[in-house]
Design a protein with these regions (language model features):
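Conserved, well-structured ligand/cofactor-binding cores
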Residues: 1-474
Length: 474
């Protein structure tokens, strides 16, 4: 192919540009690529967003055909193009950076141009021959970026958050399995990094499962609550200018059928076009999940610390050598990585919050950052949870002897004896044990405060890790 044949010339408001001949995107996409060299993350990085865009364009084409505004031939070609995008074809043509000026216009035009050029080829024409089928007049008919783009974002989140839920559920099951496995392992609970009272390692891991289970339940209901109300049909600011009066209801109905999602028209299109509250709340829930996940990873790192000079109650699977200077050192790299993912998700939430606050009047031009951060948080969390489960949780083992040793030598054990020997005796025993370094049980035996049978009964794990009725004294 000659140099001249390697490009096609397209024109827009600002003049002419040479677009790569093989590209399915067009001049407006090319301008955006040249303008926004920012994150290095293109739209194609998030396939469900591309699918959401294609579904919106398909729904719009269906409605416009039914209303008599789009010819059968154009509708058929656009439908073929959208179907291919929904199947996963041509996603590499979505090249615009996720961070962009223009409230998402570059993303919308990237979709319009790619769909138009795929459709043109299906009609037997060349890419760029927009006199036969136009990105704006036909693919974008009765739409504005301001309703098509946020609708596609919502749809992409609805379509994609199931993978996050599946990863979270699998992690919860892994925690629960470890809870069952470690149910018999007695250890010391700790508050404020100090010895507290006995518990089992199983209880600790079941608590991890429970707290993450709360988030799973909330995330399952939150997306349908927040993201199914769409402003498609509102066009520029929510008034529906340039759309058939019958278009909005029909387009949203078609979108629900195409996507399989229970989307409904927004009650107030002007409010829905400018307000980003749903994204703020959904991102806040992702942040909550990240915070909980990070706290669990902090605990795993502490419980496995040592191995000789730390707590060392559990062993994390060794994943790689830990030091270039200290031979034999193995670090808890998986929980450390998850901590960092959590920090990123928390940062994403703050950036999204500021973007939501930064809108003015009838539109929020910061929607591209909102989309980027919320899709990024979902992707990071999903991958982090899979990594944590596969490379850490399922391989954790308990150091049972170490756990029992710490219980037997802990001052905190005196709390379990308090109802039987009295607070005064318990306080004195604790002080002597602390000052002398001797064990609580050793001192109780030495002073004859309890016989061996009573001690054995009190110290049975099931009697120390749950409420127990203590007989009243005389």
């Amino acid at each position: 192919m000659s140099s001249a044949a390697s490009f096609r010339t397209e024109n827009d408001l600002l003049g002419a540009l040479d677009v790569p001949a093989q590209a399915y995107y067009g001049i407006q996409t090319l301008r955006a690529v040249n303008n926004f060299r920012l994150s290095g993350v293109p739209i194609s990085h998030y396939p469900k967003l591309v699918v959401g865009l294609a579904m919106v364009k398909q729904a719009a084409a269906d409605a416009n055909r039914e209303l008599g505004h789009l010819s059968e031939a154009k509708h058929a070609a656009i439908s073929e193009a959208c179907a291919r995008l929904i199947r996963g074809d041509f996603h590499e043509e979505f090249v615009v950076d996720m961070i962009q000026g223009g409230a998402g216009t570059s993303t919308n035009m990237n979709a319009n141009e790619v769909i138009a050029n795929i459709a043109l080829e299906a009609m037997g024409h060349q890419k760029g021959e927009y006199q036969y089928l136009h990105p704006n007049d036909d693919v974008n008919m009765a739409q504005s970026t301001n309703d098509a783009y946020p609708t596609a974002i919502r749809l992409g989140l609805l379509l994609g958050h199931d993978t996050l839920l599946a990863s979270l559920d699998s992690l919860i099951q892994a925690f629960a399995a470890k809870g069952k496995e470690f149910d018999h392992v007695l250890k010391m609970g700790r508050t404020q990094l100090q010895d507290a009272v006995p518990m089992t390692l199983g209880q600790e891991f079941r608590a991890f499962a429970t707290t993450m289970g709360e988030d799973l339940a909330r995330l399952k209901t939150l997306a349908p609550e927040l993201l199914t109300e769409v402003n498609l049909g509102g066009t520029a600011i929510g008034t529906g200018i340039n759309a058939d009066p019958r278009y909005q209801a029909l387009a949203v109905q078609r979108l629900a059928l195409i996507s399989g999602q229970p989307v409904v028209p927004a009650a107030d299109l002007i409010e829905a076009t400018s307000d980003m509250g749903a994204f703020v709340l959904f991102s806040g829930m992702l942040k909550r999940t990240a915070v909980k996940l990070s706290k669990i990873c902090n605990d795993l790192r502490l419980l496995s610390s040592g191995p000789r000079t730390g707590i060392n109650e559990i062993n994390l699977p060794a994943r790689q050598p830990g030091s270039s200077i200290m031979p034999g050192k193995v670090n808890p790299v998986i929980p450390e990585a998850v901590n960092q993912v959590a920090f990123q998700v928390i940062g994403n939430d703050l950036a999204l919050t500021m973007a939501a606050e930064g809108g003015q009047l009838q539109l929020n031009v910061m929607e591209p950052l909102i989309a980027f951060k919320i899709f990024d948080s979902i992707r990071l969390l999903q991958r982090a949870m899979d990594m944590l489960r596969e490379h850490c949780i399922v391989g954790i083992t308990a150091n049972e002897a170490r756990c029992r040793e710490l219980v037997e030598h802990s001052i905190g054990l005196v709390t379990a004896l308090n109802p039987y020997i009295g607070y005064k005796n318990a306080t004195r025993i604790a002080r002597i044990a602390l000052e002398s370094g001797r064990g609580v049980l050793e001192l109780v035996r030495e002073e004859g405060l309890l016989d061996e049978a009573s001690l054995a009964d009190i110290l049975r794990p099931e009697n120390m890790i749950a409420p127990r009725l203590v007989p009243l004294k005389g």
